[in-house]
Amino acid sequence: MKTVLRMIGLLLGLAVVANVGFVAFVAARGIPSYAPPKPALAQVLATPERLAQGEKLVLAACADCHLNRETGALSGHQLRDVTPDFGAVYASNITQDNVHGIGTWTDAELVGLLRTGIGRDGRYRVITPKFVHMSDEDVASVVAFLHADNAMAQPGPTASHPQEPSLLLKALSNTVMKPVLLPTGPVGAPTLTDAVAFGRYLLVGRYQCFECHSKDFKTNNALAPEKSDGYLGGGNKLLNAQGHEVVSRNITGDPGTGIGDWSEAQLGQALRFGRGPNGPLGAPMPKYSQLTDAEVHALYAYLQTVPKIKNATPEDGVLASK
């Protein structure tokens, strides 16, 4: 018996030492850096169609974090809706400023960042969405817009604030929240004629709704979004501008706790104007005002196919029993 107890004590001691060592390693290493990605890409041609699509995508997928509402420029600010568990997180200046922004970045370098989260300096932007499933054409449209003459993208001499990651975010960036690789081949988008497939593309590829509306940022799966814990079942904890906790909504088709009893028109009102069947939707839920009727239809069609999850969030009037 004494031998067994000694062995247990030894194993516990080794576990403590290992944990202390890991914490010390993570604290010292911080957010890791990587070799900059090298996508095979010629210069993006800025066609009128790409500039229009790029503006739509930047407004929907980038501006919420990077747009300074006072100046109208994509010069960045603190992301106050990110849980304090991750520390203080700041969106960078992505204007065309040559010193503080992306004015000297090539098209390929921007594509590498958008796809993987790794910048040309090798620094990993751990909170930045990784647009793994966005089509090559949509990515090119974003790049074209960021290098265009639009006022949002014009040089803004605001220095990007250094990140202040917590120990938790440092640990996650060294374990489960790592960068993703560049696609190994062309990435296309389904056509609007296949509403379900196109709706999935919008939700997963363009707008990444699953990131907030699945259970937890820490267990989301960028490469295989449907494998994210609690896919689209809500319960993820965010903050509003006042620092109050907001729990993401269950957007599966469960009629009791999700949006199974919503009509297509009601979904469109919620997405475009922030008005749900029971009242206004609070921040940080963005308003996708430029969604077309066909896109709303596709999103609605896809959401009908997602496995239902029974998960009541506070917005539903009752606390979840998880």
What are these regions (language model features)?
Residues 23, 106-119, 130-156, 263-277, ...:
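C-terminal capping alpha-helices of c-type cytochrome domains
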Residues 44-45, 55, 70-107, 124-135, ...:
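Gly/Gly-Pro-rich "capping" loops immediately C-terminal to redox-active cysteine motifs
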Residues 54, 61-69, 142, 199-202, ...:
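The canonical Cys-X-X-Cys-His
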Residues 1-34:
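N-terminal type II signal-anchor transmembrane helix
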Residues 166, 186-188, 201, 211, ...:
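Extended amphipathic alpha-helical interaction segments
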Residues 118, 176-192, 197, 245-276, ...:
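C-type cytochrome heme-c attachment and multiheme electron-transfer modules
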Residues 31-59, 73, 174-204:
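Electrostatic cytochrome c docking/interface patches
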Residues 21-24, 28, 157-186, 314, ...:
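Alpha-helical membrane-targeting segments
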